[in-house]
Structures are given as structure tokens and as C-alpha cells.
């Protein structure tokens, strides 16, 4: 069962990679780098928090520790979102009344007054950005995504001012911009691995200068190592495609040595064998299904019966799951 889960995980990752490829390779002309200007000192540690996934505020946290100096920082929006989960919005007047009372209960009067005024503006911003976004349309390419990111931040600057908007959202925007630009490079089918790595390093230097090398920490956990291994394969996709099958396999083994222990490599090779066996099983099934469907001497009812028997024989206890997958695929078409 555990090995089947691993196989499913690998297939899901491959599917996500294909979707990412189709999406990002449609980008058109470039958008200038650094939506958040370099003069706005955004901590590289703050950006890394967003790259790893910035968690929502929990009820057990004391929000005062994030605003001991300034009320405007990357935790401000997080704090406002937390308030909205704790204080229901029946109507704006009652909501603001409750929010004001809460802020004055946890912050000193001056900070509470400033934070409440900022929250009122934040509510108006949320309404305004929803209306603005309707005119921008849904991003369809990587270039569209960058333009959308730029447009959203420009709107925030109009509402809050440049300094405040960049302080509140700057780290998040830089993390998103870097991720989009890196993916454009990563899935470019015309580039070899070494060129992709060079361009990504150039991107880091362009966005972070002397701190470029520290923007992405070496993987520590097994999921992080596996993600880095998958990324390495994506970077060297063209190289791998141009190699004969045996050399391609050897290259993949080299990549694995960079991230996994000997025991982990053995388990991955076992999974490789099982994935190959699953693919062969499905290939054999479809060949037999085709023979049944193209047999002019069998009625449609008999064909359906024969195919169901074939599925039961080929996939055993997994036959029902296979049929459900076929139904989903047929409904999508």
C-alpha cells in the first residue's frame, strides 16, 4: 500500500509538472525585473518565509510581539486576516466597532488608533481590488502573471502609499515574482541544464545582489530533498531527453546521489520498477482492449462484457479504481 502511495505521488508530481510546463511556456515579452524596487529594503529572511509558505496567524499567538516597533510590516496583513476570522462581519459598522475594541484591548492607545485607521483603509482596499481585478482579466501566461502582480501592487501603492504598501506586501511580491521568473527558466524546452542554472543564478543576483546565494536553503527534510531532485530533473530535461535510455538512467542515478542516502536510492529504484510495471500493465491492457473493440464479430454488449472481464483480470482489486479513472478522463474530454 505504501509503495502504491509513492507511485501515485510520483504520477501526481509528473502531472503537475506537465501543467506547469503548458502554463509557463506560453509567456510572451519580458516584464522588467524587481516589482519591489531595490531601495525598499526587504529582508531576505522575510522573502524566504513566503517561499516556504507563510503560515496564517493562530489564536495562540500574541500579535503584540510583531508590532513592538512599527505597526506596518509583513505581519500586518496576516494580523488583519486573523481578525476577520475571529470577528464576524454582519455589517461594516458593527464589525469595525468590535475590531476597534479588540485592538484597544491588546495595543497601547496610540498604536491601536493607528492600526485601526489602517484596518479601515484595508477593508476599503479589499473591496476596491476585487472590482479592479475584474478589468484585468485572468492571467493566462507567465507574462500575464507578472503584469497582474505589478498591477495589484501598483493599486496597493495608490491606496496606502508606496512605503506602506511595499512594507506590507513587499516580501510576498518578491517571493512570487522570483517563483514565476524561475519557473519560466526551469521549463524552457530550448535551454540545457547548465544554461538554466546560470540564468537562475543571474536572476537571484539581479533581485538580491550580495545575498543571492542565501535565498534558497539546501534541502533538509526528505520532502525538500525530493522536491530539489525533481527540480534538478526539470532543469536538465532537454539534456535527459537527448540521451539514450541507458545513459539517461545513469544521469538520473547521479542526480539521486546528490540528494538521497543509499537506502533511499534503493527504494526509489524499486519504485521505478513498479512504475514501469504499472505502465506495461496498462499498455498491455489497452492493446487487448483495442483488439476487442475492433473485432467485427462481437456485438457491443459482448464487447462491453469482455472489456470489463479484461479489466478485472488485468487490474484485480484495483479494477474499480481504474474504471473510475477512465470515467473521469472521459468526462473531461
Model-derived features with residue positions:
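Hydrophobic single-pass membrane-insertion segments
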Residues: 21-32
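Hydrophilic extracytoplasmic domains
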Residues: 285-333
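Short, low-complexity patches enriched in S/T/P/G
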Residues: 1-6
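Charged, low-complexity interaction regions
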Residues: 86-92, 112, 188-194, 241-242, ...
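Membrane-interacting alpha-helical segments
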Residues: 118-139, 219-237, 295
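N-terminal Sec/ER secretory leader and immediately downstream segment
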Residues: 32-163, 167-175, 181, 199, ...
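Hydrophobic membrane-insertion alpha-helices, especially the h-region
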Residues: 8-21
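Extended amphipathic alpha-helical interaction segments
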Residues: 144-291
Amino acid at each position: 500500500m505504501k509503495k502504491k502511495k509513492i507511485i501515485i505521488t510520483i504520477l501526481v508530481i509528473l502531472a503537475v509538472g506537465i501543467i506547469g510546463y503548458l502554463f509557463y511556456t506560453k509567456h510572451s515579452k519580458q516584464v522588467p525585473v524587481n516589482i519591489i524596487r531595490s531601495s525598499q529594503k526587504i529582508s531576505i529572511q522575510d522573502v524566504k518565509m513566503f517561499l516556504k509558505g507563510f503560515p496564517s496567524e493562530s489564536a495562540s499567538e500574541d500579535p503584540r510581539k510583531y508590532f513592538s516597533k512599527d505597526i506596518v510590516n509583513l505581519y500586518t496583513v496576516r494580523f488583519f486576516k486573523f481578525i476577520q476570522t475571529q470577528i464576524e462581519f454582519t455589517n461594516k459598522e458593527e464589525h469595525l466597532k468590535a475590531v476597534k475594541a479588540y485592538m484597544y484591548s491588546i495595543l497601547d492607545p496610540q498604536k491601536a488608533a493607528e492600526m485601526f485607521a489602517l484596518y479601515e483603509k484595508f477593508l476599503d482596499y479589499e473591496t476596491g481590488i476585487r472590482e479592479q481585478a475584474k478589468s484585468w482579466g485572468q492571467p493566462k501566461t507567465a507574462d500575464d502573471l507578472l503584469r497582474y502582480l505589478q498591477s495589484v501592487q501598483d493599486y496597493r501603492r495608490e491606496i496606502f502609499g508606496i512605503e506602506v504598501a511595499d512594507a506590507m506586501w513587499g516580501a510576498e511580491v518578491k517571493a512570487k515574482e522570483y517563483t514565476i521568473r524561475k519557473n519560466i527558466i526551469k521549463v524552457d524546452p530550448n535551454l540545457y541544464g547548465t544554461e538554466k542554472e546560470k540564468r537562475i543564478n543571474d536572476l537571484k543576483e539581479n533581485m538580491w545582489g550580495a545575498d543571492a546565494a542565501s535565498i534558497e536553503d539546501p534541502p533538509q527534510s526528505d520532502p525538500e530533498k525530493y522536491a530539489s531532485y525533481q527540480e534538478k530533473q526539470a532543469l536538465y530535461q532537454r539534456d535527459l531527453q537527448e540521451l539514450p535510455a541507458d545513459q539517461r538512467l545513469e544521469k538520473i542515478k547521479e542526480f539521486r546521489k546528490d540528494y538521497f542516502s543509499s537506502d533511499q536510492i534503493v527504494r526509489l529504484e524499486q519504485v521505478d520498477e513498479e512504475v514501469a510495471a504499472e505502465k506495461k500493465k496498462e499498455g498491455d491492457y489497452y492493446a487487448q482492449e483495442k483488439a476487442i473493440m475492433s473485432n467485427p464479430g462481437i456485438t457491443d454488449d459482448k464487447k462491453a462484457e469482455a472489456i470489463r472481464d479484461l479489466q478485472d483480470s488485468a487490474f484485480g482489486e484495483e479494477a474499480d479504481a481504474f474504471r473510475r479513472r477512465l470515467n473521469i478522463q472521459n468526462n473531461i474530454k
